[in-house]
From Swiss-Prot:
This is NADH-quinone oxidoreductase subunit C/D. Residues 1-190 are annotated as: NADH dehydrogenase I subunit C. Its EC number is 7.1.1.-. The gene is nuoC. NDH-1 is composed of 13 different subunits. Subunits NuoB, CD, E, F, and G constitute the peripheral sector of the complex. The keyword Translocase applies. In the N-terminal section; belongs to the complex I 30 kDa subunit family. PANTHER family: NADH-QUINONE OXIDOREDUCTASE SUBUNIT C_D, NADH-UBIQUINONE OXIDOREDUCTASE 49 KDA SUBUNIT. It comes from the Bacteria.
Length: 600
């Protein structure tokens, strides 16, 4: 790591508004479809944003997927209600829009396609013929916006109950409970809800049996210890063999994206911790970075290193729980108790720095809540001296155990092609041999200044490989923390910028203008310039991202939260068909997910 962070060469600010006309893919699209076929939107997302006609969608998607360096992953797909948006200068007329975020691993570049829709014609062709993982994203977009995807294999609700009325992310849908009638659960309504939860195989294209025997349909969850949360998987069984299965999510849905439209840019920060409740400050990182792009804020070097330090502490904390519970799922109980001892040491350190444990809500727009306290370095030093020996003991006692290896090697295995098709990120993707970690591929918060390695598998992602990669990731996080300890820069813990929220306290106590700004930003919220921004990070479970749209207000016009666990659970049927029920338990333990991350 660079010892003097202030000597770094100045880079182009991440928050510049750009149209990316110099990106090669824009030229490739214009050569194929003509120079006037698209509208290119200038944003602060950091990726080309191209509006295309609905009739061109599948053709453009197919073209991008077949380029010499193809766009092989559908990273995200969702919608937006454009009807109340006032700042749309130069954009096609639209009541609603759908966006498609594609990634090219070979180019290390993205592109975002947008389709404009009229309120009286909310139809767009399904993308599932090109990218199978579009299935759940299209279901969610229909569920929350009412946009129909023609040709979808089973367009039904996924987040809301099947009996729900309306589409919650529309602007005319109430955001507060007080705008609804009081909730009542009559016996008739309870019976209706229970009937809606009854699984009907025919609705999913499943047969109830063959000529010789019937299949069993079994509910695993939504209350089952191996489901790791409120999560149901309906299994179609031939004996103990899984013929097919249907993951059923949404039981933990809290309307996190809708809340983003009602909270100020500042007051939404505590909600980000709870998207994936084990990640703590890791979840705050993409949100505050995306807001800082909108605001045009470049934070001090000290802030970057503090943020990295807290993020890596929470990464270790999450990985320890994942590894120990995986071992427990396979059948060994003891390691999980030892891991909680280690995690307590991390919580003691986090609490000393932030004042909180699991959900600090400590990152701020333009910095962090306060400076590091006295003695933080001693606590971190003690943890760094403690953890490597403990990690070695886990590996020797449990992870190298022949029974565990035999139980997990070759189970739920898939290759690079399948991982990319299903939008898999994190250790699941890297286990297939693809070296893609956002901290290295697209550094943020100063990660480019740290010396660490990215563990990569040998070509097949199975349960054992995924776990062992996480073990090595733990070692690399310890390596990063060592550099944070030895090279913490001096300087302020907040940026000197009008939109830093709250403003630095020293000025608030001395200048009436800053005091007024503090009052307005905390009570009403800071006003962000009208624009769009995007930030992805390498979170604990894969790639997490925030796509924010500002209409020049104190609140976000649209907050899109893309989480890795949502994509990973959609892959379950493809990875587990033909396996045993006991293999499914091992597979679920190896994914590393929590349902809050799935359902938001």
């Amino acid at each position: 790591m660079v010892n003097n962070m202030t000597d770094l060469t100045a880079q182009e600010p991440a928050w510049q508004t750009r149209d990316h006309l110099d990106d090669p893919v824009i030229g490739e699209l214009r050569n194929r479809f003509g120079p006037d076929a698209f509208t290119v939107q200038a944003t602060r997302t950091g990726v080309p944003v191209v509006w295309i006609k609905r009739e061109q969608l599948l053709e453009v998607g197919d073209f991008l997927k077949k380029l010499p360096k193809p766009y092989v992953m559908l990273f995200d797909l969702h919608g937006m209600d454009e009807r109340l948006r006032t700042h749309r200068e130069g954009l096609p007329a639209a009541d609603f829009s759908v966006f498609y975020h594609l990634i090219s691993i070979d180019r290390n570049r993205d592109i975002m396609l947008k389709v404009a829709l009229a309120e009286n014609d909310l139809h767009v062709p399904t993308f599932t013929k090109l990218f199978p993982n579009a299935n759940w994203y299209e279901r969610e977009t229909w569920d929350l916006f009412g946009i129909t995807f023609d040709g979808h294999p089973n367009l039904r609700r996924i987040m809301m109950p099947q009996t729900w009325k309306g589409h919650p992310l529309r602007k005319d849908y109430p955001a507060r409970a007080t705008e609804f009638s009081p909730f009542e659960l009559t016996k008739a309504k309870q019976d209706l809800e229970m009937e809606a939860l009854t699984f009907k195989p025919e609705e999913w294209g499943m047969k109830r049996g063959t000529e010789n025997e019937d299949f069993m349909f079994l509910n695993l969850g939504p209350n089952h210890p191996s489901a790791h949360g409120a999560f149901r998987i309906v299994l179609q069984l031939d004996g103990e063999e899984i013929v097919d299965c249907v993951p059923d999510i949404g039981y933990h849905h809290r309307g996190a994206e809708k809340m983003g439209e009602r909270q100020s840019w500042h007051s939404y920060i505590p909600y980000t911790d709870r998207i994936e409740y084990l990640g703590g400050c890791v979840n705050e990182m993409p949100y505050v970075l995306a807001v800082e792009k909108l605001a045009g804020i470049t934070v001090p070097d000290r802030v970057n290193v503090i943020r990295v330090m807290l993020s890596e502490l929470f990464r270790i904390n999450s990985h320890l729980l994942y590894i120990s519970t995986f071992i427990q799922d396979v059948g060994a109980m003891t390691p999980v108790f030892f891991a909680f001892t280690d995690r307590q040491k991390i919580y003691d350190l986090v609490e000393a720095i932030t004042g909180f444990r699991m959900h600090p809500a400590w990152f701020r727009i333009g910095g962090v809540a306060h400076d590091l306290p006295r003695g933080w370095d001693r606590l971190l030093r003690e943890f760094l001296d403690w953890m490597p020996k403990r990690l070695a003991s886990y590996e020797k006692a449990a992870l190298q155990n022949t029974i565990l290896k035999g139980r997990s090697q070759g189970v739920a295995a898939y290759g690079a092609k399948e991982a990319l098709e299903w939008g898999t990120t994190g250790a699941g993707l890297r286990a297939t041999g693809i070296d893609f970690d956002v901290r290295k591929a697209r550094p943020y918060s100063g990660y480019e200044n740290f010396d660490f390695e990215i563990p990569v598998g040998g070509g097949v992602s199975d349960c054992y490989t995924r776990v062992m990669l996480k073990v090595e990731e733990l070692r690399q996080s310890l390596r990063i923390l060592e550099q944070c300890l030895n090279n913490m820069p001096e300087g302020p813990f907040k940026a000197d910028h009008p939109l830093t929220t709250p403003p630095p306290k020293e000025r608030t106590l001395q200048h009436i203008e800053t005091l007024i700004t503090h009052f307005l930003q905390v009570s009403w919220g800071p006003v962000m310039p009208a624009n769009e921004s995007f930030q992805m990070i390498e979170a604990t479970k894969g790639i997490n991202s925030y796509y924010l749209t500002s209409d020049g207000s104190t609140m976000s016009y649209r907050t899109r939260v893309r989480t890795p666990s949502f994509a990973h659970l959609q892959q379950i049927p493809a990875a587990i068909r033909g396996s045993l029920v006991s293999d499914l338990i091992v597979y679920l333990g190896s994914i590393d997910f929590v349902m809050s991350d799935v359902d938001r």
